[in-house]
Amino acid sequence: MPQIKSAMKRVKTIEKANNRNASQLSTMRSAIKKFKAAQAAGNEEAADLLKAATRAIDMASTKGLIHANKAGRDKSRLNKMMAK
């Protein structure tokens, strides 16, 4: 446990950031899973879910939660799934 006041504040700040980042990553993963499930089932709403998943991936990339190359790779794979 930190003894210095500023270090104690940083611990709180880091915990908040970790929670926010975990939530955003979870949202991204959920959006991808929803799209994959809809695509496998052949639902017409898969196109809308693809848009939502792409948006979630872009947000995670913008926030620095995932690398830009991973974001591009994930979006490319989802678009290929949609094309089939």
Curated annotation (Swiss-Prot):
Gene name in the database record: rpsT
Keyword set, alphabetical order: Ribonucleoprotein, Ribosomal protein, RNA-binding, rRNA-binding
SUPFAM superfamilies noted in UniProt: Ribosomal protein S20
Protein name (record): Small ribosomal subunit protein bS20
Keyword Ion transport: no
Record-level GO cellular component terms: cytosol; small ribosomal subunit
Organism of derivation: Latilactobacillus sakei subsp. sakei (strain 23K)
InterPro entries: Ribosomal_bS20, Ribosomal_bS20_sf
Keyword Nucleus listed: no
Short name of one Pfam family: Ribosomal_S20p
Function: Binds directly to 16S ribosomal RNA.
Family: Belongs to the bacterial ribosomal protein bS20 family.
